[in-house]
Amino acid sequence: MSPREQQLRQRLEARFAPTLLTIEDESHLHAGHAGAAGGHSHFRVTIVSEAFRGVSAVARHRLVYAAVDDLLKTDIHALAIEASPP
């Protein structure tokens, strides 16, 4: 697990106490892409949390982005999100 993936996991676990959290590093799919410089920059997150109950899909994405905002500005180029309540 890369340091970026560890940071991402720690942030999401602390903020959402998920019942399910999977993080896939998809950086290898973007080799040669300008945003892929340095590797470990493209991630797919699947997260299930009670915090998402009654929250629209757009709002769930905003919550996830807010939890990792500083990482998106510096280390993570792309984040695909599947967020849902249990």
Label for each model-derived stretch:
Residues 31-49:
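A short, structured beta-strand/loop element
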Residues 1-2, 86:
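Absolute protein N-terminus
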Residues 19-21, 43, 79:
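Conserved beta-strand core positions
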Residues 53-86:
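C-terminal structural segments of small proteins and small subunits
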Residues 2-36:
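N-terminal first-folded block
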